Structure formats: C-alpha cells, structure tokens
Amino acid sequence: MASELDGLPVIATRREEAEGFLQGLVSKSLGWARKYSLFTYPFVTACCGMEYMTMASARYDSDRFGAAMPRFSPRQADLLMVVGTVNCKQAPILQRVYEQMADPKWVMAFGVCASSGGFYDNYATVQGIDRVIPVDVYVPGCPPRPEQVLDGIMLLQKKIQNQSHKLIDRKPLPVISGGAGR
C-alpha cells in the first residue's frame, strides 16, 4: 500500500542523521567563508620578496581573492607564505613560526628556492621547505609572476573549500550553586 509520502526525498530519519546533515551544511559554509578570508604571514628571505610586494600591490589586487594585507604576527595568520631561500639556520625559526599559527593553517611555497632549494644546492640550504613544515601549495618560478601566485591562491581556495571543517565540541560549563546563607 503506497502512502502520500512515497517518492519524496527524506532528509533524515534519525537524530544522528539530522545532526550529520546539519554538520555537513555548517562545514560547507565554513569552507566557503574560510576560502575568502585568508590572513597571510609572509616569511620573506630572498629576492622573491620583490615579486611578493608586487603581488600585494593594487595592480594585482590580491584582496579580491581573500588574501588581503599581511599580518604582523603568525598568531593572527592562517596562511604562511614562505618567500625565497631558507637556510639551515632559519629552518628552526620557520618551524617555530608555523607552530605559532592557530589551526586551521596553510602553507604556500613561493618560488623555486622555497619549493626545492633553487640553484643553491649546498650544505647550508634547505632543499625544499617541505622537509621542515608541511606545504599545501607550491608556486613555481624564479621569481614567480604575480599571476602564478594568484593562481596558487585560487588552488588553495579550492582545497580549503573541499576540506571538512569540524566544529569544536564544547562541553557545558559546570553550574556552581552558591548557598544563600554563607
């Protein structure tokens, strides 16, 4: 015997399914919001810094992609842009900067030197920052053109939007009842 509801889509039948559906919607909303609000922290060490300044200028307008003005503290940033060569003495500093960033955090290797050590193949140069910290996007070039950097930002935005964004489970605070006759 067919009922009137046959053929209609059912969103959720149990409470757990409804919570999963709601968390999925919230996760997609957070992904959309986070992809357009990247707070960058530039770790500039070499000549690619000139191209970074060009990319951040009004001509290329990185603000329209959500990567606005750079932050002056890694604690305020969620995108670490490693610009240029990193030597072995700077590697612990870079790792400390990465650890100071709050989650979620992403890393962009800006240029060939940050990606693979560039033409500095010697004992003092880190042959790619992925040996020190995890990297999300590699931007090639020596130095990379601003268009390539903006393309890397758009690739990172796609990655951010497709990630699952978990909500923080906050337990309720305990209720402290005070007696009236203390």
UniProtKB/Swiss-Prot annotation:
- Reported cofactor(s): [4Fe-4S] cluster
Keyword Disulfide bond recorded: no
Q: Which reaction does it catalyse?
A: a quinone + NADH + 5 H(+)(in) = a quinol + NAD(+) + 4 H(+)(out)
One GO biological process term: electron transport coupled proton transport
Topology of this chain in the membrane: Peripheral membrane protein
**UniProt-annotated binding residues for [4Fe-4S] cluster:** 47-48, 113, 142
Q: Which UniProt keywords apply?
A: 4Fe-4S, Cell inner membrane, Cell membrane, Iron, Iron-sulfur, Membrane, Metal-binding, NAD, Quinone, Translocase, Transport, Ubiquinone
Where is this protein found? Answer: Cell inner membrane
Which molecular function GO terms apply here? 4 iron, 4 sulfur cluster binding; iron ion binding; NADH dehydrogenase (ubiquinone) activity; NADH:ubiquinone reductase (non-electrogenic) activity; quinone binding
Which EC class, in a word?
translocase
Main subcellular location: membrane
Task: Note the InterPro entries from the entry.
Answer: NADH_UbQ_OxRdtase-like_20kDa, NADH_UQ_OxRdtase_20Kd_su
| UniProt remark on cofactor binding | Binds 1 [4Fe-4S] cluster.
One GO location term (cellular component): respiratory chain complex I
UniProt EC number: 7.1.1.-
- Assembly and interactions? NDH-1 is composed of 14 different subunits. Subunits NuoB, C, D, E, F, and G constitute the peripheral sector of the complex.
- State what this protein does: NDH-1 shuttles electrons from NADH, via FMN and iron-sulfur (Fe-S) centers, to quinones in the respiratory chain. The immediate electron acceptor for the enzyme in this species is believed to be ubiquinone. Couples the redox reaction to proton translocation (for every two electrons transferred, four hydrogen ions are translocated across the cytoplasmic membrane), and thus conserves the redox energy in a proton gradient.
Give the family per the record. Belongs to the complex I 20 kDa subunit family.
- What this protein is called in its record is NADH-quinone oxidoreductase subunit B 2
Q: Which organism is it from?
A: Anaeromyxobacter sp. (strain K)
The UniProt gene name for this protein comes to nuoB2
